[in-house]
């Protein structure tokens, strides 16, 4: 998979600012891994061990069906939504730290409004970010806004189920 470089640039900027930008950085890593197809196939054949529960504990060579949480589409939707919220919070945190570092005096509500009208990140969801920063221009992190806090709390149980099922099924979900 090709890259335009914006994710990589964002990840480097986050590291320069000592700011976690985990979801974007993991997306960059996923692209890099995607390009290593022959190595991924070989590794999968060498490390395809399954999990098993014996006496209430995990052991090797188990059947994955032991851990069937019966995830619903709604569980996955909620988990993706929570990850999206975290990604936006991390991105705006990076903007805030860079603005402080470089003396940019950025208006985050306006940035979200501009992006909503047509940029890399067009989304109706950006209106909620605009509203959060209109309410509190000095908002330290989007996760401290009432809307974002409530949405994370609502999504948290499904998010945990999806991540647990992924881990127990041998499916890496680093951006979750």
Spans of features found by a protein language model:
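NAD(P)-dependent dehydrogenase/reductase Rossmann-like domain
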Residues: 1-52, 58-61, 70-176
């Amino acid at each position: 998979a090709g890259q335009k470089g914006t994710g990589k640039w964002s990840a480097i900027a986050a590291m320069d600012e000592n700011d976690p930008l985990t979801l974007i950085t993991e997306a960059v890593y996923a692209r890099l891994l995607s390009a290593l197809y022959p190595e991924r196939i070989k590794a999968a054949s060498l490390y395809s061990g399954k999990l098993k529960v014996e006496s209430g504990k995990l052991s090797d060579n188990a059947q994955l069906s032991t851990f069937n949480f019966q995830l619903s589409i709604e569980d996955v939707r909620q988990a993706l939504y929570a990850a999206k919220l975290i990604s936006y919070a991390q991105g705006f945190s990076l903007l805030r730290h860079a603005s402080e570092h470089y003396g940019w005096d950025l208006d985050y509500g306006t940035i979200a409004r501009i992006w909503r009208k047509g940029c890399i990140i067009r989304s109706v969801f950006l209106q909620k970010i605009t509203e959060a920063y209109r309410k509190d221009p000095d908002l330290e992190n989007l996760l401290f806004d009432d809307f974002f806090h409530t949405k994370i709390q609502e999504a948290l149980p499904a998010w945990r189920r999806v991540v647990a099922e992924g881990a127990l099924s041998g499916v890496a979900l680093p951006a979750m």
